[in-house]
């Protein structure tokens, strides 16, 4: 899996909002804190808003905030909001692939990959990242 700049920035912006708690956070503050282009960030925040993960308010007292508690938003939710499915092969879901001959088992490889990507990204919430406390199923993968 390749994590694009857009997905990385979306997760970082969502983590900034989670760390800020309640109340609006200016886009400029997020952009400065995470060293993200404000223009690109605003586009990403728009996608997160469209997906129902972020709310916004215009004006002097406006800004962005999470639409749900940080403990209810997974890293997978954020990535899906800006990139679509977590794992695809040539833009196709693995279950829709058709291989022939000796390549037939590859379909199961791609399905297993997707299952594991989902397991990690769906188990980590924004609250986990803010707390610096990742689930055991994630930290266990890092053990030597």
Specify the residue positions occupied by each region the protein language model found.
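N-terminal helix-turn-helix DNA-binding core of bacterial DNA-binding proteins
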Residues: 3-37, 64
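Short, hydrophobic-biased segments on the C-terminal half of alpha helices
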Residues: 14, 45-46
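Alpha-helical residues within the helix-turn-helix
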Residues: 32, 49-50
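Beta-hairpin "wing" of winged helix-turn-helix
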Residues: 52-66
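Conserved segment of winged-helix/HTH DNA-binding domains
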Residues: 70-95, 106-107, 111-116
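C-terminal regulatory/oligomerization modules of transcriptional regulators
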Residues: 95-144
